[in-house]
Amino acid sequence: MGQDKALMRLASKTLLECTHDLLQECLKSIYVSIKEDQIGDPVRAKFKLIIDKYNQSGPMAGILSAHKIHPNSAWLVVACDMPWLDKKTLEQLMEERDAAFDATAFNSPEDDLPEPLCAIYEPNLLSGVLSNSNLLPTNSPRDLLMQSKVKVIDAKNPNALKNTNYPGDDLSEIES
């Protein structure tokens, strides 16, 4: 995209701030995963941070770093570039979670594959990845979900799973 999507603005807030505010409505504890070179960023400094500690690039480094800090916790993972995400969609994901699976994820309306960046990852799956790197041949959370036992659910509001990928994406119709 050419710019840090977390810092894109939606009205008076960044997408990261909007996502954090939304998660606060549903969760007790929220962490923001960052790369080491983002440590001094003033927007991110407002939040509880998890610094990526693994060689994986992208979201997988953050997911594994979070698991390393709290290895017995399931992790609800949300990308900050989903400005249409709403509380009802997060509640649906949490209500339909099944810890007997490796993860619970929405069926992506774009490609009918598990949506890895609005999903709940169970601790057994993440422990398995850390103890056996063969479980993660790529750095892709989606690939991990596709080779795991995942409860895939259909979002009641599939539009909530849209992300913003282009500088020209129209965010004007989103309520802040």
Q: Predicted regions span which residues?
A:
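Nucleotide and nucleotide-moiety/phosphate-recognizing core
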Residues: M1-T138, D143-K162, P167-L171, E175
